[in-house]
Amino acid sequence: MLIWKQSNGIFGKENIMQKKGHFWKVLSCILITVFFIPSAVVAGDKVYKMKAESVYGPMSKTTTEGLFRFLDLVEEKSQGKIRFQRFSSGSLAKAKEALDALEVGMFDVLLSYPSYYAGHVPEGQIFLIPYLFKSMKAIYDLWYNTEVGTMVSETFREKGSVILGPQFLASNVVATRKQISTLDGFKGLKIRAPGGVGSKTVETMGAVPVMLVGAEIYTALQRGTIDGYVYPLYSTWDYKFYEQAKFIVQPSLGYIITFIWMNKRTFDGLPSDLQKILMDAGKEHAAYLLDWAQKSDEKIWGQLATKGVKPVTLSEPDVNNLVENLKARVWPTYNQNARCKKILDICIKHEGWE
C-alpha cells in the first residue's frame, strides 16, 4: 500500500505537473494573442516608404532642424505608416532642378529655398522680399491666418507639388569681408545672392549679385571671388564664414523661410488621415521652428562676438533711403500676375506699410 501510495503520489505529481504545463501553454497563447496580434495587424497595414531630400548639407541646421526633425515627427504621428529614406546635399537632384525633379516623381519630399524656382512659381518668392516683414511671427500669422498661405500653396499644387509647411530658420543677413559703414560702400562689391528677389535686392544696394550655392561661399570669400554674401545668420558660425567675413550689416534684410514640398501625386495617393497628419505636422513643426529660430539668432550673435565678428549698423537716413528704393524697385517686381499682387497687398496691409 505504501509503495502504491508513493507510486500513486508520484503519478499524481506528474499529473499535476502536466496540468500546470498545460495551464502555462494556454496562458502563453493568451498572452501571445493579446500582445502580438495587434502588432501583426499594424504590420499588415500599408507602409508608405518615401524618399526625402534636402538640397543643403547633412549637418546644416536647415537639414537637421528644418527637414529631418519634421520627418521624425511624421513617422511618429503616423505610427510608422509613413517612413522616409533621407538624402541631403542635393544627392537626388541639384538645388535649381530639385523642384522639377520632385514634381515629375523622382522623389517624394523636398526641402529647399523658393528663390531657386523664381521663374517656375513667382508667388513663392513673397517671403524673400526685403524689409517687408517686421518679424518672423508676422510671417507665421500671414501663412496660417490669412489667405496668403492658401494662395501660395495653390500655385505650387498647380505645378505638381504640395507645401507641407513653411520653415523658419534665421535672420537673412548681408556679411562682408571689409567693413561697410554706409550704403554707398556697397557700390561695385560682388555679393553672393540666391537669385530672384535676392539678386534684385543686391542690385538695389549698388552691388553686383553673384549666383552661388551655399557650399561655394567659403572658397569664393577666401579667393576674393566675392566680397560678401546674403545668407542665414547661423551660417556665419556653422560654416566658419567668420574666418573670411567679420562684418554683418544691420538691420537684417529679412528672414530665411524655406518650404517642405511633397509630390502632389504622392500626397493625393495617401489616405485622408495620413494627409491630415502631414499637414498637422507641418503646422506644429513651423511653430517649433519659429521659436527655435528666434532663440538661435540670439545664441549665434553671442558666439560670433567671441570670433571678432561685428554688427555694422547703417545710419537711419541710409536705412530709410534703402527701404524707399526697395519699395520702389524690388517690391513691385513680385507683382508678376494678379495673384501675386493680391498676396503682396495683403502683406503690405498686415505689416502697416500702407
Question: What do the PLM-derived regions correspond to, one by one?
Answer:
Residues M1-K49, E354:
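Short, low-complexity disordered leader/linker segments with a strong preference
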Residues K13, G44-I139, E147-V148, E154-E354:
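N-terminal secretory/targeting leader peptides
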